[in-house]
Amino acid sequence: MVTPVTWMDNPIEVYVNDSEWVPGPTDDRCPAKPEEEGMMINISIGYRYPPICLGTAPGCLMPAVQNWLVEVPIVSPISRFTYHMVSGMSLRPRVNYLQDFPYQRSLKFRPKGKPCPKEIPKESKNTEVLVWEECVANSAVILQNNEFGTIIDWAPRGQFYHNCSGQTQSCPSAQVSPAVDSDLTESLDKHKHKKLQSFYPWEWGEKGISTPRPKIISPVSGPEHPELWRLTVASHHIRIWSGNQTLETRDRKPFYTVDLNSSLTLPLQSCVKPPYMLVVGNIVIKPDSQTITCENCRLLTCIDSTFNWQHRILLVRAREGVWILVSMDRPWEASPSVHILTEVLKGVLNRSKRFIFTLIAVIMGLIAVTATGAVAGVALHSSVQSVNFVNDWQKNSTRLWNSQSSIDQKLANQINDLRQTVIWMGDRLMSLEHRFQLQCDWNTSDFCITPQIYNESEHHWDMVRHHLQGREDNLTLDISKLKEQIFEASKAHLNLVPGTEAIAGVADGLANLNPVTWVKTIGSTTIINLILILVCLFCLLLVCRCTQQLRRDSDHRERAMMTMAVLSKRKGGNVGKSKRDQIVTVSV
């Protein structure tokens, strides 16, 4: 899941392990995971804008040796000038004056910055430091001009040439470089002595100690990418030269000699940090299909002097996500509470007892889930605001750290780490924000299944395949447009209570349990309603009569019971009395 870094992307941070000879952020602790360096990978990805590639292949910027020269105080009476020169791997110009001349001096593409000096920069006798100062040359060099795009560089390209001013005879004005060898490694390894001789004075053109900053100007215009040079310069060690230019007399004519010697080389290492990585191997870029393929490539984070330029380097970064088509064997549901609600209510409808309490409990669960999502959304929104504030507050603190103390260098490295970390965190938070805004199926946690229905007529499989490869040139597959469609579908689900269909089924079931509906179904006419009223009155009457009869029977039983109780009480008290009295008593 990687996507190429293109010329339209912002420059990334490339860290070197030596700040005295190479400007920019430094870090000698890379790679972070040495055991994972060189992992094999096969890639087949697409692109929209031209990708950034380094190496000897179509669509890639080719390497070349570049020199940077400074003057030092003269130490010999026969020397016109004394030099210190640094040679290292850089980016090769591809000059075509007839086709590329309009680009080379066009003010439209000229960057803002200080012009390069008119004189060679002065330096002390100490060769242990090199002060870099960014400047803009009088004309640009063409690094690439083909079907992949036009890439230029406004950094100075210093080299020796003949000074023909004031010369009456024919003077060869062609530029000559002390490193013109076709074999790059041979020019930096085997040739440790350079000598240039001529009857004309030697001059150094394109003064200035500045690093290349290539940028694309066609078919689109993008930002400068100074980090690419830090990758190429670390692919081979840099060589330090010392020498001078002497003036002699030959055949009664002045004779000029530039003599340079080298006995010092410095190995370098350049690294990128996640989410960026380097794909190294036989990379093939196909502009017709806008795809990049590489089989049996290696995935690296660092480049050092052991790199072989028979391979190519492709800058890639981890992809935030991809939209794919899926099919489900069940209805799409937004949360587990909806699923539980549906399953529970199926059983509850068959058993009406405790239905209201269960319904209240489930609804309270839905409210709790909704409240949790709302709180999470607020927290995420606050986090995004904090990241934007940090991004606005954070400034580009990359300077010429080689002229600062060691503690300033450490602070600079921490700031660079913070900046790249903040950018990475910002991308992750934006991805999380989109994730929270989407309505996803509850039964998948590693990825999000949205309720958006796939329309084959609008997005046929070729478009989907291009999207999976990373190509976004088709407007119908533009990610932002697709997200808007999915957000609209999600909002449609958010406008309704989750589980609306299940709750609607419950409402229908409750309506069927209502006796009033039965009466309405049976008694839809006045006669039936009247008969029902008479039946009700008859039943009421019958109940009243039964109640009265029961009360009378109860009164008779009470009197009989009282009489029997009185007779039982007087049975023994009448013995010895006269028969008359007994009769009277009985009569009473």
From Swiss-Prot:
Modification note: Specific enzymatic cleavages in vivo yield the mature SU and TM proteins.
Tissue specificity: Expressed in teratocarcinoma cell line.
Further remarks about this protein from its record: This envelope protein is encoded by a human specific provirus. Has a type 1 genome. The HERV-K(HML-2) family contains type 1 and type 2 genomes depending on the absence or presence of 292 nucleotides at the 5'-end of the env gene resulting in Env proteins of distinct sizes. Despite their overall retroviral envelope structure HERV-K(HML-2) type 1 envelope proteins lack a predictable signal sequence. Subgenomic RNA transcripts coding for full-length envelope proteins have been detected for both type of genomes.
Top-level taxon in the UniProt lineage: Eukaryota
GO cellular component: plasma membrane
Record keywords: Cell membrane, Cleavage on pair of basic residues, Disulfide bond, ERV, Membrane, Transmembrane, Transmembrane helix, Transposable element, Viral envelope protein, Virion
Sites annotated Cleavage: 354-355
Protein name: Endogenous retrovirus group K member 24 Env polyprotein
Complexes and interactors: The surface (SU) and transmembrane (TM) proteins form a heterodimer. SU and TM are attached by noncovalent interactions or by a labile interchain disulfide bond.
Entry's Gene Ontology molecular function annotations: structural molecule activity
Known role: Retroviral envelope proteins mediate receptor recognition and membrane fusion during early infection. Endogenous envelope proteins may have kept, lost or modified their original function during evolution.
Origin species: Homo sapiens
Spans annotated as Fusion peptide: 355-375
Family statement: Belongs to the beta type-B retroviral envelope protein family. HERV class-II K(HML-2) env subfamily.
A Pfam family the protein falls into: HERV-K_env_2
